């Protein structure tokens, strides 16, 4: 087999591939063995018709498509290996010559991975992030814990206030007509939570249990149900019950209730401070890593093929579909609820897909430029770390991974980002 690669404009080129006649005849033999099993000919058992008689009756050309299906994938794959190109989309195949006892000649128009011209990626200026934890930060975290431990207690007297939970019946009308999904009974609505459309919750403030009110609102222009978007509506609301938050007292007992590792309120505050410090440090590290990667990607010159963006979009949609399934939803339901469709979803994701592809290509180029390698020991150490994290045997992790090659590539990327961070400077 012989293969020649000719680069055309942009990221497109043509592979010209010639396959020896011997391989062509082998593919025709294999095609005949496959096809003859499906033919009923009087005087012969199924699959036993002689080849010469078959060709005389049906013509050798009747085997060509099956033979091509056999020979093309192998020849194309070998041509890719021989020329060292990296296709990113299915090729456009054009058969120039295919006959029995003759060499096969075909071309494949191929879109390949683009060349990356790296810009500045060493010495990138990154913003220094303050990771100081103040007393106010600790107090706010303590208050949040206190809020989460609060109990809802029925208010026998009084009116709805911000922060209360009102148990209500409601029914919505647009132009005097009730609409689907606009009715609820004994619904617990936290006032000030922003659960309902803007303006709804505020109009319940001041009502007593047993009172009713017509709440006038306008659906937002971007509301997911297109038939309601931007339209004024009236909700008939009845308040059945009002519940107020009763906060627990901040003392040693509270501290022990929320964290079994501490015995006093002071110990809880110290633990909160440590956790906040670790969280801020972790967040700062992530921001720095994201910043250097984004700057290195922005500084590079790349002509990204649309095929790579489409492939990434398909991957992102699959990831999104998996997340939906974990919430008991599927894409069709999501499209109904949001008034969107597959094309609109992809359009929303396209910018992120372009960003992902650009970053991946740039990191790959940096790995090559800096000769970043990963030793087998590093891969094994990472597998052991994963086994400890998931509380699984090392062999089970290896089996789940299948090949360690993908993990090694992930570690190279991590090293490339480490390199960018280590070689950055404070802005």
Curated annotation (Swiss-Prot):
Principal localisation:
cytoplasm
Q: Which InterPro entries match?
A: PPIase_dom_sf, PPIase_FKBP_dom, Trig_fac, Trigger_fac_C, Trigger_fac_C_sf, Trigger_fac_ribosome-bd_bac, Trigger_fac_ribosome-bd_sf, Trigger_fact/SurA_dom_sf
* Domain (PPIase FKBP-type) ranges: 163-248
Keywords in UniProt for this one? Cell cycle, Cell division, Chaperone, Cytoplasm, Isomerase, Rotamase
Name the SUPFAM superfamilies on file.
FKBP-like, Triger factor/SurA peptide-binding domain-like, Trigger factor ribosome-binding domain
Instruction: Please state what class of enzyme this protein is.
Output: isomerase
Q: What GO cellular-component annotations does this UniProt entry give?
A: cytoplasm
**What Gene Ontology biological process does one annotation of this record name?**
cell division
Q: Which reaction does it catalyse?
A: [protein]-peptidylproline (omega=180) = [protein]-peptidylproline (omega=0)
Any GO MF annotation of the entry: protein folding chaperone
Q: Where in the cell is it found?
A: Cytoplasm
Q: Does the keyword Chaperone apply?
A: yes
Q: For this protein, what is the EC number? A: 5.2.1.8
Query: Is Protease set as a keyword in this record?
Result: no
The protein's job, in short, is: Involved in protein export. Acts as a chaperone by maintaining the newly synthesized protein in an open conformation. Functions as a peptidyl-prolyl cis-trans isomerase.
Hey, which family's this protein in?
Answer: Belongs to the FKBP-type PPIase family. Tig subfamily.
- Annotated domain remarks: Consists of 3 domains; the N-terminus binds the ribosome, the middle domain has PPIase activity, while the C-terminus has intrinsic chaperone activity on its own.
Name of the protein this chain belongs to:
Trigger factor
| Organism, scientific name | Bacillus cytotoxicus (strain DSM 22905 / CIP 110041 / 391-98 / NVH 391-98)
Query: Which gene name belongs to this protein?
Result: tig
